[in-house]
Amino acid sequence: MGIALENVNFTYQEGTPLASAALSDVSLTIEDGSYTALIGHTGSGKSTILQLLNGLLVPSQGSVRVFDTLITSTSKNKDIRQIRKQVGLVFQFAENQIFEETVLKDVAFGPQNFGVSEEDAVKTAREKLALVGIDESLFDRSPFELSGGQMRRVAIAGILAMEPAILVLDEPTAGLDPLGRKELMTLFKKLHQSGMTIVLVTHLMDDVAEYANQVYVMEKGRLVKGGKPSDVFQDVVFMEEVQLGVPKITAFCKRLADRGVSFKRLPIKIEEFKESLNG
C-alpha cells in the first residue's frame, strides 16, 4: 500500500474564532503503482488532501500513512521531511515553485537540498529536463524568461529530480493550450507506466476516464464515492448532482440510452463506444 488516510479530520485555524473544517472523517487508500484521480468542486477538500499527502499539513485527527511513515497531529518534522522526499507535489501553478537564477540550478536545487552532491544533482537535473521536453539550449537561461508552459515543465522537472515514488498533481494543465495539455498528460502517463504512483486533481472528467484506474469523489469535506472510473461514471445522475458530470462520451450515450438505445454499460471512452457499436 502506498498511502492510507484513516478517519482524517482537518480544520484550518483550529482553536480560533476563524476555525474552518476542511475534511471530515475521510478514509481512503492509494495503492502503490496506481493512477488515482481526486475530483470535487472548489472547497470540497481536494487540495487539503494533497497537502496532507506531502506533509505540508498534518491531520487534526486521524492519521496519514505514506509507505512506512505514519503522520498524526503530533508527528515530528523529521518524519514529515522523509515524506516530502517520497511524495512530490506539483501545485496548480507550478511555475510559482521556481526561484533560482537558471533553469539548471532550479531543477538541481531539490536533490542538493536532500544531500545529493552538486555533480550528481546537476546530472539528474539534465536528465529530468530532457524528460519533460526542455531543450539543452535553455538550461542556462533564467526560468522567468521562458513561456508559461516551459516554466511549468521546469517546475515539474524540479519535482521529478528528487526521484519521488509518488507524484501528486494539482490541476497540472490549468491554463495550458490543448497541445501543451496533451503533452503533459502523455508525460504523466509514461511516468505511471514506468512504475510511478500518480495522484491527479482535475476538473476534466475525460482525463479521469482516459488515465486513472481509481477515482475518489469529494464533496464538502467528505468522501462521497470511490472506485474504478468505469464504475463511478455509471451513476450519471449522482455525478450531475454533485455538479461534476461525466465524460463527454458517457453523457452522449446516456442520452441515447434515455431514447431506447441499449448499452450493457455506459462507455467512458470513445474506444469503448466504438466497440459497443461493433458488438
Curated annotation (Swiss-Prot):
CDD domains: ABC_cobalt_CbiO_domain1. GO terms for molecular function: ATP binding; ATP hydrolysis activity; ATPase-coupled transmembrane transporter activity. Keywords: ATP-binding, Cell membrane, Membrane, Nucleotide-binding, Translocase, Transport. Its EC number is 7.-.-.-. Residues 3-245 form the ABC transporter domain. Its main location: membrane. One of its GO terms (cellular component) is ATP-binding cassette (ABC) transporter complex. ATP binds at residues 40-47. It is an enzyme of class 7 (translocase). Forms a stable energy-coupling factor (ECF) transporter complex composed of 2 membrane-embedded substrate-binding proteins (S component), 2 ATP-binding proteins (A component) and 2 transmembrane proteins (T component). Belongs to the ABC transporter superfamily. Energy-coupling factor EcfA family. ATP-binding (A) component of a common energy-coupling factor (ECF) ABC-transporter complex. Unlike classic ABC transporters this ECF transporter provides the energy necessary to transport a number of different substrates. This is Energy-coupling factor transporter ATP-binding protein EcfA2. It comes from Streptococcus pneumoniae serotype 4 (strain ATCC BAA-334 / TIGR4). The gene is ecfA2.
